[in-house]
């Protein structure tokens, strides 16, 4: 299941500036074109609130999100969105928390410590850098796991262990 080492890919990317950062910029990008009136200002300031509101409204418009749907900006990229989903969706079903690196362990800790779900949580863990037996998870439980363990260098190679007829939610 785990990729513990790495080998050089056979072809190099045309532009190596991709990943979680630095990211490849759009054609014609120039840092001097960025507005700086919010630099050093809190998101709670008048200008910060205005800028966030504009970004949210623009997002709704560009993505054609229905008027009666809510849209928001969540900090911390995927981590913030994952936490938001956990806090709003976990609870009705038992939880299988699968972790083998720091993000997954943090999400398990939040489910127990902050959400108080310890009585309905089963842990599937393995030493740092290896995967637990993911096939042992229950199709009727919600599952928490990190698909690409960036802190440990271990990723799940496939999702064959997730049942096609599952009734629980899958968080990854």
Where are each of the predicted segments found?
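A short acidic, amphipathic alpha-helical/loop segment
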Residues: 84-85, 110, 156-161
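Solvent-exposed alpha-helices and their adjacent loops that cap or buttress functional pockets
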Residues: 9-10, 64-66, 89-90, 135-138, ...
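Active-site phosphate-binding strand-loop segment of PLP-dependent enzymes
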Residues: 127-172
